[in-house]
Amino acid sequence: MASNNTSQRSGFSSFFCRLKTYFCNHFLCLFVLSFFPLSFRRLCLLCHLCEKSNLWLSSDNSASVVKQEREVLPTNVKPLHYDLTIEPIFDNFTFKGEETIDFQVNEKTNFITLNSLEIEVQEAKIDGKSVTDISFDAGKQTVTFKFDDDLSTGSIAKLYIKFTGELNDKMAGFYRASYQEDGKTKYMATTQMEPTDCRRAFPSYDEPAAKSKFTISLIADKELVCLSNSSEKETVSLDGNKKKVTFQTTPLMSTYLVAFIVGDLRYISNDNYRVPIRVYSTPGTEHLGEYSANIAAQTLKFFDQQFGIDYPYDKLDMVAVPSFSAGAMENCGLVTFRTVDLLIDADNANVNTKQRVTEVVMHELAHQWFGDLVTMEFWDGLWLNEGFATWMSWYACNSLYPDWKVWESYVSDSLQHALTLDALRASHPIEVPVKRADEINQIFDAISYSKGSSLLRMISKWLGEDVFVKGVSNYLKKHKWGNTKTSDLWEALSEASGEDVVKVMDIWTKNIGFPIVKVEEIGNGEIKVTQNRFLATGDVKESEDKTLYPVFLGLKTSEGVDESSVLETRSKTIKLPTSDDFFKINGDQSGIYRTAYEPARWTKLGKAGVEGKLSVEDRVGLVADAGSLASSGFIKTSSLLDLVKSWSKESNYVVWNEILTRIGSIKAALMFEDEATKKALEIFTRDLISEKLKETGWEFSADDSFADQQLKSSLFASAANAEDPEAVAFAKEAFAKFIAGDKKAIHPNLRASIFNTNAKYGDEKTFDELYNIYRNPSSVEEKIAALRSFGRFTKPEILDKVTGLLLQTDIVKQQDIYIPMQGLRAHKLGVEKLWTWLSENWDQIYILLPPGLSMLGSVVTLGTSGFTKEEQKKKVEEFFAQKDNKGYDQSLAQSLDIITAKSKWTDRDAKSIYEWLEANEYTK
């Protein structure tokens, strides 16, 4: 699944990839980039049938029951096939259904337990005999059917269930998605089963290892479109203007990948692939699916070739769903998307949106093999799905669109997202033990998406991309239609490469965090490298520093990059192969760690960057490492400022993006400091970018490359945000023309920045104008940009209006609540207002976004992590100490870590930052 994290650090990303993972221009604080489980966050998980050693016999019925470490179903039966018929009833937002599940009986038993949530069972039969002993466990989300007679071992049992449920508005299970058409609210019925919401749609064995076949039928009004995972088998007319559409039986798949949709839909098709490709959307928007359909055709061909396995399903439908919590969902053969991540006017979209849509489509299609065809055994293997799909989307994009140079962006995007979150004490290993269903959504974060993909990139660099992809192909062929553990992938890569991948990667996947590698120059052409755990707060305890990672040092010298040297102990001495005093650790930034040099080496590397001795990835990594080391206290922030000041002539967009992000993180940390320091930092920012901004300007032409467009838009956004008079004046003038009817006055690449700037300086009239754009947009992209800008207003009475909209789901969709919150986080008044809103409306928020869904943790993080002071942190702790933290406890812990890190940073460096700005004459 693609995360709903919409940060546009580079436009090609991640939150993410349930984060991926969307639409933000810049998060001022780098720390928060990781915390929108992208959706950016994604969904996927529960638990699997345990090993025999983890079972015990219950004395009353002899059925194998899993120990309570993990909430999974008994293994006395195994589902083989579901024959499911379901009908949505839009008049009262309910649905009714019936199913017959074929089970293989593994042992003599007199009961079957299934997952069920908010489902009313009206009737049940086992092998045609009525079942009346039916009990529910709301806490475990199960229903148990107890029979008069035992089922015999080895037999096939048929359990018939007739049921009803709510066509809910929670964007989970079988739910209703609303949209406007001709001023009227209309609905479609759609599904989101991942991670554990198939149980909301029909009673099921809702665990990823319980793969079954499904024959699905939908009953609906004749004029509505019905879709499911497989192609249509037959349609039968029913009384009352109804029809029953039955679909072909699916191949083996997990319940979280089941999908069905009923609605008034139109489609555009692409015939450039061997199976039909269609993009569905609400009437009048279908033409906006052409770009994604073309991307899909190219991508499926590419993956067929790379994996050596043809796309495994009989069609590909991609559907834009108007109410959708994640970025996208990889249901077999029926992929669902947020509208903004599928539909695009390619001729009028900004470059970051185009890149985002491309990445999301590629990510979901990679899942059709990696996740759907071959599926994780249980949910602590989530990263297998998400990390690989993220890596594969970058790999495919680099192959199909080499001019985009996405691996350069990767270092500033996925890698930094991963390192940022994993530097928190409240992070988690790539492989996470999951006990309860309400814990699952919390691990749809940058660790699953970005650290997972970063680890795979590191392996691919070590083994070579061709060998890596060959190993993956072998893995898919060996395990197709089955389930796997992480070790299965490592073994396949070991066999393909001859390297001991299992030994190396077990350490990376099963331990929290990553190291900082300190480089000491000891003379005689030798350096000593030492690894310790890195924390954003800079206060690692001895007990937290036990893991020794296999660190691929990637020693770069004038002779190239030596990939053979690995640091597996605490320290190691290395003889440099050259005597010209040029070296850098982590060449091309392939490794997952930070590097700390002696002060003189930072200066020399800064000079090497200017002289062209460092690759784009090296330069990005150097800035990122300096920024992270400054915020955590390993170096002074003035050293970071010295480095970026020396690179004012930098020409690469990705490097500039990292520079501006790091300055943004300083600004966020200083948010509650004195105005003089903040004003001086703005003056420095304007001076830093002035020469390059004058060179590039912000006019766009048909001759501009992808990178040219990104650089112009990024520099303009930073100039306007730093109150550059010329940029601000242009933003105001362009907006006035736009409001007056000149729709060409705002270039798509500048739209978000211009909206934000006008909001920042705007009044009630400006708010009304942006609100009108939001309610009557010309594109989804324009709608999102207007919504995000709401948070940029600074007048208290307008901020009251903005926060007043957050819980009005008829105006701001539940899925979009975080978008104006991102804007509010950009300034001091907004951060304070956001906390006031969160604390005063908590009970209502908790009802709207219950902990079992993925968005509550994101809202908690957004509403709290903008703070920078210990007294503010204490206020947050005291508030949540009185609340039930279930379902968002990890997000809260991470947010508190973020506040601590910023508090320590400002206590340590605020004075020296001002002194540096003063010494460089930025305080006038």
Curated annotation (Swiss-Prot):
It is found in: Secreted, Cell wall. Metalloprotease that specifically hydrolyzes peptides with N-terminal alanine, arginine and leucine residues. Substrate binds at residues 194, 327-331. The active site is at residue 364. Disulfide bonds: none annotated. Pfam families: ERAP1_C (PF11838), Peptidase_M1 (PF01433), Peptidase_M1_N (PF17900). Zn(2+) binds at residues 363, 367, 386. Its EC number is 3.4.11.-. The modification N-acetylserine is found at residue 58. This is Aminopeptidase 2. Its cofactor is Zn(2+). Optimum pH is 7.2. Inactivated by metal-chelating agents phenanthroline and EDTA. Inhibited by bestatin, an aminopeptidase inhibitor. Not inhibited by pepstatin A and PMSF, inhibitors of aspartic and the serine proteases, respectively. Not inhibited by carboxypeptidase inhibitor. Residues 46-57 form a propeptide. The record marks 449 as: Transition state stabilizer. Residues 1-45 form the signal peptide. Optimum temperature is 30 degrees Celsius. It comes from Candida albicans (strain SC5314 / ATCC MYA-2876). The keyword Ubl conjugation does not apply. GO terms for biological process: cytoplasm to vacuole targeting by the NVT pathway; peptide catabolic process; proteolysis. Belongs to the peptidase M1 family.
